[in-house]
Amino acid sequence: TFEIVKTDVLVVGGGGAGCRAAIEAHDLGSSVTMIVKGRLGHSGCTFNVGTSAAVGPWGDSKDTTDSAMRDLLSHGGFLGIQDLAKTLVEESPDRITELEKWGIDFQRNDDGSIAMHHASGHSFTRNLTFKPRPGVKFDYGILPGFAMMDILINQVKSRDVNVMDDVTLVDLVVNEGKVIGAVALDCHRNVLTVFSAKATILA
């Protein structure tokens, strides 16, 4: 037996990218279903490295997005896709501002300004550090992904997003060269679910 779920947008993955995609799709007026192969909030994104980098008013006034893009591409051996690198660099300041608006906390100086540091591979000081959520020890690692995911999960839960945990993608459903949904396995109930979606996002 199998079940059918209809949705405007199907998001596959519950990490940072998946949560942000679900938020955006919902805010644009779509019905959204997110399937997560484990539990929401327990993805690879939770173990994000110690800092995030973005050009903005918090950093060096001489820094530019062009400089950040050169650093990103050159230290990646020019293997990165330039269009994606450009999007990452240009969107990062707005995403940092958005996370701050949603309640994320940064390491700060005594005067209250965001504490910055100059990380390896960067031409300018552009690295910000999220404060870990309570209970995460600094000597174990800052793990800002926990802090970021807490914020994103709260935003997802505050919206009418249908989150389905422990559901694993089996295959995409394709008709005439277009993806029209997916087939997934509900691991708790051992039931196949067919998702009919106008758009499917692999996040």
Region locations from a protein language model:
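Core beta-strand elements of the Rossmann-like FAD/NAD(P) dinucleotide-binding domain
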Residues: 3-7, 188-199
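N-terminal Rossmann-like FAD-binding beta1-loop-alpha1 element of flavoenzymes
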Residues: 9-34
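Conserved N-terminal/central alpha/beta ligand/cofactor-binding core
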Residues: 37-180, 184-186
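Secondary-structure transition/capping motifs at alpha-helix termini
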Residues: 26-33, 158-162, 188-191
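Hydrophobic/aromatic ligand-binding patch that stacks against planar heteroaromatic rings
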Residues: 20, 24, 44-45, 200
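Conserved structured core elements
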Residues: 19, 93, 146, 194-195
